[in-house]
Amino acid sequence: MASQFCLPLAPRLSPLKPLKSHFTDFQVGICVAIQRSDKRIHLAVVTEINRENSWVTVEWVEKGVKKGKKIELETVLLLNPALASTEHQRSRRPLRPVSVIPATAIGDQRTATKWIAMIPHRNETPSGDSQTLVIPSNPCLMKRKKSPCLREIEKLQKQREKRRRLQLEIRARRALDINTGNPNFETMRMIEEYRRHLDSSKMSRLEPPEDHRICVCVRKRPLNERETTMKDLDIITIPSHNVVMVHESKQKVDLTRYLENQTFCFDHAFDDTASNELVYQFTARPLVESIFRKGMATCFAYGQTGSGKTHTMGGAFSGKAQECSKGIYALVAQDVFLLLRTPAYEKLELKVYGTFFEIYGGKVYDLLNWKKKLQVLEDGNQQIQVVGLQEQEVGCVEEVLNLVELGNSCRTSGQTSVNAHSSRSHAVFQLILKCGGKLHGKFSLVDLAGNERGADTAKATRKRQLEGAEINKSLLALKECIRALGKNKSHTPFRASKLTQVLRDSFIGQNSYTCMIATISPGMTSCENTLNTLRYANRVKELALEARPYPPTDHEMPLTLENGNTNSEKSLQKDDIIQIPTVQKEEEKESDELTSTKEPAASWSRSGPWWEAIQETAEGVNCDVDFCIAQSLSILEQKIGVLTEIQKKLQLLRDDLQKKSQAE
């Protein structure tokens, strides 16, 4: 490069020879080459010489402005070696101008060639914008002296680069140690390769959700200490604000490992860095104001035991103590009391009451009254009443937190194979607004017990197995009620469990709003439970995944990455029936067979609701399987004749059209 050429080597100065002796070669008005701070080299006129301090002052004109600077004598001699000795000055030969900067680089002379020139004295001031310099006929390379500051900077830079190299070596060594000791190293490599091809979106780009009667969100927790010790893998990826991907490791017959990537779409998805405040902002917060408009709001956390439900609803744990001020309980209470003081609702003179009870083994217990057993009855107005439930009036957030702490201390918990401190009951905390002693609105915050698979509780005690069966039964009933709420069905199966009976007023009516927070564990050992949770949440509100092509990976076996289906299989709907193609009107007039074909097709389309009725019955909690099968077979036998007749008519119509086309 041009910038690598420097000046002719100056005669080496003897340490005994003072620098002042070289001032004999300097005169005010001569032109010398100087170097700017941006590495440009151009000519300047010497205007002052300080022999005591060994520096000179130079001036030049740049862009119509006269500039100047002080330069040490040693620096000037390095750039002007011809001044170092009178012998060199006397034997100076004529110099020729050479362009050192291309014409296209006017104004930027950082790559200017570092040549020195001695030009006879002129009356004009040299310009810093000049593109040409007069150079000696025999230029040679020289070593430019660096300032102490620059030398220190370079020293620090070398030390920094050395430290970085050492850190990279240490990280590579640690990664190698981890990988060799991790039995799932191949799966981890496939997951990392797949994630590198995904486009992540920032959580800060989230917008408040639309006004839905039901909102389904998913929250992923980080790997806990137990999973990290076991060298478990994080198999959950959240590429955008509403998509969750599960990388399930599978094995082929030839023992080749591959990934089956299952994708789910929800209203919102939160990764392991999301705080409780962020989760609350997009889940329960939009529902708070609805209870001031005589609405019934419900927010519940669902997921595997140990996936973070109680952490989300109640707050973070510090040992066995829970910080309730950071949970959704406290955040809802803060917004309720803030809205209560606004002018729009202050005139209603509303009072706030709090209740806290649990549902364990199909029975209801009051957590604010020493776990007193309660009865759930239906009055003459078909309203569910929890007889004996204690309601305590609260006037601030601190009083609400006291109720939460009191209830959590009495809540039933136990030890499972997954979680040493697992909640074994459904806890329901309610904030009730009353106006003149009458119910105005209610917000139910439900911390559900963890769902469990039978395989996980096979070695558990009989008590734990009965607990798990009762929990799963109530969760199934809750799912059906929420689906009926989301689809505006006329029938809601809330009598299937005590949990749905207690929350009946949250499912019935047009002012009912529900938010579900599905918490999932990221570990590979929890893959089956995570998929069950996501399928449950997906069935609650089936959202179509937006068609977005994710970039495939270029790896072949054994790094095969297969994209699995995203959502759980949808049931057959009446719109899925095969439709008969429409024939042009001219052919309809010419063919009598087509008219007869319309009649069975019409009867088939009119019989669409029968399948929907059977489907709704089969999806119920207490459905009779034998009755559904018998009813379906009976109806299908009746429809077989209709389908056979349609088939014959279509064949005749096709033959007729072929004959006409041949005749033409």
UniProtKB/Swiss-Prot annotation:
CDD domains: KISc_KIF2_like
Modified residues (Phosphothreonine): 125
Location(s), subcellular: Cytoplasm, Cytoskeleton, Microtubule organizing center, Centrosome; Cytoplasm, Cytoskeleton, Spindle; Chromosome, Centromere, Kinetochore
One of the protein's GO biological processes: microtubule-based movement
Presence of the UniProt keyword Metal-binding in the record: no
PTM description: Phosphorylation at Thr-125 by PLK1 is required for activity in the correction of kinetochore-microtubules attachment errors, while phosphorylation at Ser-204 also by PLK1 is required for the kinetochore localization and activity in prometaphase.
UniProt-annotated binding residues for ATP: 303-310
Disordered, as annotated region: 583-607
Taxonomic superkingdom: Eukaryota
Chain ranges of the Kinesin motor domain: 213-543
Any Pfam family the entry gives: KIF2A-like_1st
Key word Ubl conjugation present: no
Residues with Phosphoserine modification: 204
UniProt GO cellular component terms: centrosome; cytoplasm; kinesin complex; kinetochore; microtubule; spindle
UniProt entry keywords in alphabetical sequence: ATP-binding, Cell cycle, Cell division, Centromere, Chromosome, Coiled coil, Cytoplasm, Cytoskeleton, Kinetochore, Microtubule, Mitosis, Motor protein, Nucleotide-binding, Phosphoprotein
GO-annotated molecular function: ATP binding; ATP hydrolysis activity; microtubule binding; microtubule motor activity
Coiled-coil segments: 149-177, 642-663
Entries under PANTHER family matching the protein: KINESIN-LIKE PROTEIN, KINESIN-RELATED PROTEIN 6
Role description: Plus end-directed microtubule-dependent motor required for spindle assembly and chromosome movement. Has microtubule depolymerization activity. Plays a role in chromosome congression.
Sequence similarity: Belongs to the TRAFAC class myosin-kinesin ATPase superfamily. Kinesin family. MCAK/KIF2 subfamily.
Protein name from the UniProt record: Kinesin-like protein KIF2B
Organism: Rattus norvegicus (Rat)
